[in-house]
Amino acid sequence: MSQAPLAVYLSSTNRMTNLPLQYVDLLRYESSVALLDQNGENTLWETVYYSASEQTEIYKSLTFIYALLKTDGDIDVLDHLSIARIDFCTFGNTQPFRIRVINRLNDNYDHFYVKRADASRAYGLELEYILSPNHVTFLVDGNTLIEEHVAGIPGDDFMKNKLQDTEFNQIRIAKEFIKFNERCFVRLLGDMRSYNYVVDITPDIEGSQIRLRTIDFEQQSCEGRKNFYLPQYFKDNNPIIFLGIQHMSPETVRQYQMEERSLIAMRAKSSRVRLNKLLHV
């Protein structure tokens, strides 16, 4: 990442580190096969394979990177971890690598991503950390960015399979979308089509709590059109928009908008030193 002021800021917030592997190193795979979902549909991801001479070192480096991301480099956890799979996304401009890490003690798995570092993505991740209720851990080294996995149902899958719910849950879905719409606009995060966020569902005493979480921060403050930063204007999101029209009055919509703006303002005040440093980069 060549933007020196941004690199200085990231270093001051402990985002910069020395990685044993770079994004370009993962591009040296020898073969790949399409990764299919449970229904046999193409996921637009490919599982990639490396030569035997390179695989051992790559897997070792990726395991260490996972320890840096999750345990601040505590190498004691490495004894129980191994790399199960490396996937490469062929869709869009980002083209990330998704790394699946297995805990051999219980066969539980987790993921993280290796991406090209750029200023827009770094700004977006930092603003997410400061202004949203969601924290995404990430690390940067030169032109490589490591990003933790955000768990949830992809927005487009959620639209297809999860909207036919109780009226109570449908109202909560519409409410969360209103708040998500505000969060994206206030911090100028664009292109929130349904495949660029996930839906985190938490069972509650009555019904479920819904949280929409961004997974693509590439389009941060990069466009002059207002509507680009409002998820409500992307037709992919129409099914949720229609839920809002069905269940919400204009007064209720304004109430939820004001609630979220107040929460964002509170987060900005509580992190004002860090936010001011970022905005002056």
What residues fall within each predicted segment?
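AlphaC helix of the protein kinase catalytic domain
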Residues: 157-164
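Conserved kinase catalytic-core segment
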Residues: 165-226
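Phosphate/pyrophosphate-binding loops and the adjoining catalytic core of nucleotide-dependent enzymes
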Residues: 23-42, 260, 265-272, 279
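Long, charge-dense tracts
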Residues: 1-36
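Conserved ATP-binding subdomain of kinase catalytic cores across diverse folds
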Residues: 18, 22, 40-156
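Short secondary-structure boundary/capping segments
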Residues: 131, 164, 228-232
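C-terminal catalytic region of ATP-dependent kinase domains
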Residues: 204-281
